[in-house]
């Protein structure tokens, strides 16, 4: 309940940044984590735009032996995430600076096992959207997964992230609103 109240307060105050009408549900979060696939023991998972932490919690649970790093722009969400998910590393900042954050944490590109995103990328200004995709491409080596969710699969059909190959999407009806999980693989 506390997560929902926090989310709705931030959604009302910062609609463009939040980009959703409700926090992601646990079923969607579980599917997002499973879609990542297996990770090597030293791999980290980077989450972009964790919001209230539904995906963060699912990632920590699904990958108990791997480090989860979440990058969140909203300071209110950051404060709540740090308290709610102490096993995750929470970075307050912009997803477009992900390569810099990985360098600061001493994480090699080869050890980034996946990027998971809850960002409303297609609602962002085009320059920022491009910068975020560039950051994802710079961070992931070939063959590694990038998992995005959206409420509008149609909008994503017209947009394919440069440097990534799409895989079949999955509709998640047990979420409000229903969502689509979009898996991509970093191309060589």
Please provide the spans of the model-predicted regions:
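A short glycine-rich, Lys/Arg-flanked "PGG" loop and its adjoining helix->strand segment in the class I
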Residues: 130-142
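Core SAM-dependent methyltransferase catalytic element
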Residues: 171-188
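Conserved class I S-adenosyl-L-methionine
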Residues: 41-51
